[in-house]
Amino acid sequence: AAEVSKVNNANLVLEALGQGARKYSDIATYTKLPASSLASVLNQLGSLDLISKDYPINAPDNLKKAQYVFRDNMVHFYYKYIYRNISHMGFMNPEKFYDLFIGPDLDTKHIPKQFEAICREFLIRSNKLNRISPPFFKIGRYYYDIPKLKKNGEFDVVTEDQTGFTFYEVKCRNQPMTPAQ
């Protein structure tokens, strides 16, 4: 029974991540797991390389800004679209299942986030091939907070080298871009 509970808790945490909960507090709210159980599940999933804890490049020790992310795109896709809807699959035409549960946000939310990871990987590979000058030694997200303007947010693809930070604008669209874009 304890092993089944552990599997259920792991699935619940992975489902929370799949539905967009990234911060510890958001995962806790979604899963309603006790803090000790949640911490244990997150550690176990991390040790299995299913998830990792991601910190902003400019705040590597800020636990409040840490986010949990999937390490594998297929696992991410499964828990985002399939896991919570799997009971419907046996009763539906595959195209209708896609239209109802996957299609509505695949191009507008899921793929653009994955594209950011692809861009980070491209930059890392380019850096290793000495195609970026000066070479960077860190890559990640950059968090900002402007209390006077009551504004905060993050940049998704940022590198750091000996001269400072370089910010990259990453957009994924399902349409051709014009030269002005």
Q: Across the structure, where does each feature detected by a protein language model lie?
A:
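Mg2+/Mn2+-dependent nuclease catalytic core
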Residues: R173-Q181
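Conserved catalytic cores of phosphodiester-cleaving nucleases, focusing on short active-site segments
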Residues: L123, F155-N174
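Accessory nucleic acid-recognition modules appended to NTPase machines
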Residues: A1-E154
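Residue-identity detector for threonine
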Residues: T29-T31, T108, T159, T163-T166, ...
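Short conserved micro-motifs at the rims of enzyme active sites and ligand-binding pockets
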Residues: K80-I82, E169, P179
